[in-house]
């Protein structure tokens, strides 16, 4: 049976309920007050065709959204609700997300190109996350009595409060999932949010906003603005009524946001780039390590901040590992993410496509050896990059040092564990890492000494909302996900009382 992908795409677009070129403010879809420019065209990266447009909000729209969120927060609706009451709404949102999973996943696929099974997984994991944070909110005790044995005339408490208006700026690689990683703990803890998703893939966030309204989230708790980072993102970053900023994106943009936040002394979390190392030791179970290494770089077209783009493999097993990687790369089915057989979709945009191609060309020019993949076919429609592996890589090569954000793997060999550790830590980034070995002491050595916020042993890597998401070095600040992430969106007060 032939699948008509054009019909599938048309059905997804027709099923959307968010009006074209709209923002979501105070529980309503609205047009920009004063657009910064013409609407932004949205392109399906698998076909290079324009499938619609989105709003291009100005600073005035940002101000409207923030003022609305601020007034909503100050009113006490939501912020002063008991955690159990907020939890009921969060659980209703989870239920409705599951009911709309095919639509939400389909929107993300036509916006950013990811294969449908991965997009569906994203939506399912987000619904699970709502359930998790519903339980956190329901069971959280924000007031804790602190014993003062040296001050018997006093009683003391630590009390946590929601911060206020949270500004959230998120990327295009996981359009809805990255937004909800920040949004869910923020609203679960009683805050109001102004969300600016990427203008390359904004539709699922707008559709999600309507789900929240229908689930009973009070108007003004979630506001969504769409526009360029230069205009609306910058305005959100420096708005004086923002109490906290949460950003996921590039290191360069993260530095700008940190500078803007500093002007108002606004705390923030930053999840920035990565150049994550994966180490395969001589005693590793290669039947596990090889497919894991392939998945770690080729998943989501390599458009993941934790993509293991540096493979450090023991010289004694290097040939077998490389042969296995070539085999795994050749198994991938490249094509339109709407096709259920596809396992590697296009990268998100022409800009990203050209950037990745330039890295591949740079590696070739610098003498690296391409063992699979390489430059894409020039006549091919769509922003497709073949899964690519380079050996003969030097540590000064761009593909070893810089984040590519595509399905491009750089491989180096090592002789001793100390040498592997030095290679792993020779990076400005410190987000993800992984080690494959059957020796517990080897695993302990690497997990204790790799300079990264997350380390996966004999896997790569478990991403779950129960565990904290942490970037070291230039990979970020603060903590996402888990109860630690929930507490990031709350401020702490010390209360003491004289009791005689």
Curated annotation (Swiss-Prot):
An individual GO BP term: cellular detoxification of nitrogen compound
Entry protein name: Probable betaine aldehyde dehydrogenase
Alphabetical list of Pfam families matching this protein: Aldedh
Organism the protein comes from: Schizosaccharomyces pombe (strain 972 / ATCC 24843) (Fission yeast)
Residues at the catalytic site: 271 (proton acceptor), 305 (nucleophile)
Pathway: Amine and polyamine biosynthesis; betaine biosynthesis via choline pathway; betaine from betaine aldehyde: step 1/1
PROSITE patterns, sorted: ALDEHYDE_DEHYDR_CYS, ALDEHYDE_DEHYDR_GLU
Record keywords: Meiosis, NAD, Oxidoreductase
Entry annotated with the keyword Signal: no
């Amino acid at each position: 049976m032939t699948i008509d992908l054009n019909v599938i795409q048309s059905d997804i677009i027709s099923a959307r309920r968010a009006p074209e070129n709209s923002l979501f403010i105070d529980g309503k879809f609205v047009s920009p007050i004063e657009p910064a420019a013409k609407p932004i065209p949205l392109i399906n990266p698998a076909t290079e065709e324009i499938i619609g447009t989105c709003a291009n909000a100005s600073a005035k729209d940002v101000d409207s959204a923030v003022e609305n969120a601020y007034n909503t927060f100050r009113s006490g609706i939501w912020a002063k609700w008991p955690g159990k009451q907020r939890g009921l709404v969060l659980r209703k949102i989870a239920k409705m997300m599951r009911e709309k999973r095919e639509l939400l996943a389909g929107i993300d696929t036509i916006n950013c190109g990811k294969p449908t099974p991965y997009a569906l997984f994203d939506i399912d994991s987000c619904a699970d996350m709502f359930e998790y944070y519903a339980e956190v909110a329901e069971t959280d005790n924000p007031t804790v009595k602190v014993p003062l044995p040296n001050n018997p005339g006093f009683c003391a408490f630590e009390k946590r409060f929601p911060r206020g208006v949270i500004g959230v700026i998120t990327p295009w690689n996981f359009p809805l999932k990255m937004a909800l990683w920040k949004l869910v703990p923020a609203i679960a803890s009683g805050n109001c949010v102004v969300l600016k998703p990427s203008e390359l893939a904004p539709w699922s966030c707008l559709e999600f906003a309507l789900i929240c309204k229908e689930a009973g989230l009070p108007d003004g708790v979630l506001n969504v603005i769409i526009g360029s980072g230069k205009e609306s993102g910058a305005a959100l970053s420096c708005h004086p009524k923002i109490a906290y900023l949460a950003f996921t994106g590039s290191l360069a943009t993260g530095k700008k946001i940190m500078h803007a936040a500093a002007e108002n002394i606004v705390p923030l979390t930053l999840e920035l780039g990565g150049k994550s190392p994966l180490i395969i030791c001589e005693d590793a179970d290669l039947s596990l390590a090889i497919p894991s290494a392939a998945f770690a770089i080729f998943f989501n077209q390599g458009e993941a901040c934790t993509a293991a783009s540096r493979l450090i493999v023991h010289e004694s097993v290097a040939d077998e590992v490389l042969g296995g990687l070539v085999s795994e790369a050749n198994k991938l089915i490249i094509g339109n993410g709407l096709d259920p057989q596809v396992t590697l979709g296009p990268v998100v945009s022409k800009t990203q496509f050209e950037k990745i191609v330039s890295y591949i060309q740079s590696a070739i020019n610098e003498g690296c050896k391409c063992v699979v993949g390489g430059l894409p076919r020039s006549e091919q429609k769509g922003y497709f990059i073949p899964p690519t592996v380079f050996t003969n890589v030097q540590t000064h090569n761009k593909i070893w040092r810089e984040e590519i954000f595509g399905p491009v793997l750089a491989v180096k060999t090592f002789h001793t564990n100390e040498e592997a550790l030095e290679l792993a830590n020779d990076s400005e980034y410190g987000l993800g890492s992984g080690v494959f070995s059957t020796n517990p002491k080897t695993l302990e050595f690497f997990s204790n000494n790799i300079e990264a916020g997350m380390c996966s042993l004999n896997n790569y890597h478990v991403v779950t909302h129960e565990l904290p998401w942490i970037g070291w070095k230039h990979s970020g600040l603060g903590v996402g996900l888990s109860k630690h992430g929930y507490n990031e969106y709350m401020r702490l007060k010390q209360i003491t009382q004289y009791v005689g």
